[in-house]
Amino acid sequence: NAGTWTIEANGADIWAAADAFRFTYQETDGDFDLSARIVSFTDVHEWSKVGLMARQSLDAGSPNVFVNLTGTHGVKVIHRDTVGGPTGPDPAEPNAEAPVYLRLVREGDLFTSYLSDDGAAWDLAEIAGAPAEVTLALGDPVFVGVGVTSHIAGTLMTAEIDSVQGSFLPVEPLGKVAATWAALKASR
C-alpha cells in the first residue's frame, strides 16, 4: 500500500487502434496480481477512464488489457489483441461507481479482472456477456499499472487511487522498496 495516489491526466481515449492517456506503471515479468481502490475522479466526459492495465509495450497501439471505471458508464473490461488493432468489447457494468476496488490478475496468457466493494470479497468483472477472463499472449516483460484518460485531449481530470497492492513489487531486506514506478503520458 503506497498511500493515496493523485494522478492528473488528459488524453483522447484508451480505445480503438491507439491510446492517449497517462500511465503510471511498473515493468515486470511473469504472473502478477494488482489491485487498487478507485477513490474518486473528476469525470470530465462520460467516457473518462481510470483503472488497471497491462501492456505489451509503451507504444500507443500496444496490445493491452484494461479493467476500468468510466465517467458515467460504470466498470468496463477492454482489450486490444494486436498492435494497432481494435479495442473492445463495449459492454459496461453501469451500477459501479467510485469508490470501487479493481483487480487485474495474470496467470500465463490468462488475464482475469475483478471488482469489489470492500477489497476483500472479489467478484469476476463479467459485464453484460463480456468475459472477465481474456487470453492474450503479451510475453515478457509487460508494463503494469494505473491508466487514466480524460477522454478530451487538453482537458485535465484528477483521479485519486489508494490501497494499491501488487504481487510483483519486489522488496529488499530492511523495508527498502526496490520497485520503481514511472509515469508516461502517451498521445496519438
Protein language model features and the residues they cover:
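Residue-level hotspots within well-ordered secondary structure
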Residues: S187-R188
